[in-house]
Amino acid sequence: MCKINKPIINLTATAARIKGYRLRCGYSVREIQAIFNFNSAEAIYSWEKGKYLPTIDNLIVLAAVYGVTIDDIIVRDEIEIECELDIRDEKSA
């Protein structure tokens, strides 16, 4: 058995950053909706509430609009998981 740290996205903190950058840049939800040419603002509200993440394409657009990088938007955490196979033993073989 081995234990490794698996990177994950902190959805709640990422949602807060998405909303924070929008507010800091002075955009309304409707303006972001127009930039994406969405029929409704539901997706933006869902991103900002942490219901789900934007697609990678939409993250690229958000980063460009807000003048930041995708790494600035996404909050990364790690969780420890157990492996059935000890990958350290495999690497040395």
Regions from the language model: what does each represent?
Residues 57-72:
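DNA major-groove recognition helix of helix-turn-helix/homeodomain DNA-binding modules
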Residues 22, 33, 63:
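The alpha-helix within a helix-turn-helix
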Residues 47-48, 58:
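DNA major-groove recognition helix of helix-turn-helix
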Residues 19, 30, 60:
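Residues within the helices of the helix-turn-helix
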Residues 26-46:
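Short alpha-helical DNA-recognition segment
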Residues 2-8, 64, 74-93:
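Short, charged recognition helix plus adjacent turn
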Residues 1-24:
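A short, Lys/Arg-rich alpha-helix, primarily the initiator
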